[in-house]
Amino acid sequence: MSNITPQEIKKEFLKSKMGIAGIVILTILILTSIITMIIIPIETFQEWNNPESWITYPKAAIPIWVNLFLTEKIPEHKILAEPNIETMFNDEINLTSYQFNVNFNYDQFPKDFIYSYLLEYSGSPLIQVSVIRPDGVKLELVSTSLPHSDLKTIHSDRMFSTDAMIKKELVLQEEKFEFEINELSVEDIVFSKTESNKPLKGNYVFLVDFYEINEESKIIDSKLIIGGKAFGIMGTDELRRDLAIGLLWGTPLALFIGLAVSIGSVVMGLVYGIYAGFKGKKTDETMMRFNDVLYALPALPFLIILSVTISNSIFVMTGFLMIFGWVGIAKVARSMSLQIKTRGYVEAATIMGQKDSKMILKHILPQLLPYAFASIAISVPAAITTEAGLSFLGLGDPSFPTWGQILHDANTFGAAARGLWWWIVPPGIMIAITGLAFVFIGNALDSIINPKLKR
């Protein structure tokens, strides 16, 4: 091992293009993690496996930017939660009207549409839903009364385009079309041209009228969902979850797992190896035989057994990875410790009666720190890929949206066979990029502290 100061390491590292590239990638990952934890609501993390939280999202939707490369535009999924509101209260009528403007410029019909509302009322309000199309044709969709209540009650409901009463209402307006509509779906009828069954592009206005709403009643929530086939910058999975959120939350989780395992393993191995090499004789022999036993154990089968029998918690898994990750570090640290303790200044300190702990901390440990930092950087990718592998096998913590867990879900629902590439490729790329950052940094440090590796 060469004697090299921290200043020299820094100077040489800044000359390394590989090291600089690794630092740039790592900085981007750290900034992504910080922004994710600050901006994205923590509820999206906590509710990742709660289907109710994602019910308004589309199922297995492609990313919206794919439309840039398609001649036939795919309809985007739209969640409209801020309608224009008009109210009218007089002796003749009490009306609250919600207007949802939908700009539809796609070459395919939407999958469906849903109107959901939450209403506090008394009496028996009447709800009428209609749509004014770009060609000026107005279609009545549904007219229904809510259950009568003398007391204030809170009522929530959803109206689906698949409801039979909506299809029945549209069939009664068949004269507005020049072709047969009986066999068509509701969304195909609503978004179709009058002369042919092709999408009608333009601005649609969905009107939701609440009649007999008194001044004491109030509409708490009103939302229109146009079910599209494209959503977000990363699309959605079969469980309707926004994959962009999963990928972003996976970044701090990957860094936590990788750094926690690598730092823990290196510290354990460093302390163990230095102490064994410094003490020597029977202590060294006993400690290294125990190290050999652990080194010979097949790590993956044991990790599988431990995760099944004890716990698949991400924190417990991190501990398991530390247990199997320090043995190789200990062997190298022990060999370095044996070399350093034979040097004159260490022998002089021994003759002067310095304590073992002081000699280790003052004379041996500082010389192993460059190796320790390089080992930490190089060990991170292994920890991340091991966690991803265990999660892919179904042995990870399902409550955390790690990249490995996303790949596991993709495999479970046959994403590869179904061509859902956006569910598979991005998490794989993120794992590769994160690993590459630490490999670049580790190799740059390794070439500095081991000059023989330089080319």
Where is each model-derived feature located?
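Alpha-helical transmembrane segments of integral membrane proteins
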Residues: 236-455
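Gly/Trp-centered helix-boundary motif
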Residues: 1-258, 410-428, 432-433, 446-455
